[in-house]
Amino acid sequence: MDMIETKALEFAYPAEEGEKPVLALRGVDTAIEKGSFVVVLGHNGSGKSTFAKCLNAILLPCGGKVYVEGMDTQDEACLLEIRRRVGMVFQNPDNQIVANVVEEDVAFAPENLGVASEEIRRRVDDALAAVDMTAFMTHAPH
């Protein structure tokens, strides 16, 4: 089974009043094997980010299907598990900072995965120590 598979994937951004929807993806078929490395290349506005957001269900297709390890991104019951498997690093760091201090930002992911508070504390401390950032624990993340 492929790690990620798309079948005739389509996505259109909603239209402004009086305009047509903007079709960003049309008929995208992809099969990505677990452990493989994939590069998505294209000009600005060609749909690369839209495609990536469809893979982890930040955006849902308006046509076709996206499967992550066999789970359909349009199945609400699978969304958390899909997002555990397909992460995203945004191009602009400001779009991924979610807290006012470094330690809270580092804790965000395990909190959303339901990790116990004591374990989150240990993981945050270990992660900051591993990159020599313990002194910045209570600083703003930017």
Walk through the language-model features, giving the residues of each.
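The feature captures the beta-strand-to-loop junction immediately N-terminal to the Walker
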Residues: 41-43
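Short helical segment in ABC ATPase nucleotide-binding domains corresponding to the A-loop/adjacent helical element
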Residues: 94, 100-111, 121, 125
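Conserved ABC ATPase "signature" region
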Residues: 118-137
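Signature (C-motif/LSGGQ) region and adjacent switch/coupling loops
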Residues: 99, 103, 137-140
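Helix-to-loop junction immediately C-terminal to a conserved catalytic motif
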Residues: 56
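A short, flexible loop at the N-terminus of ABC-type nucleotide-binding domains that lies
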Residues: 1-3, 12-27, 39, 76-78, ...
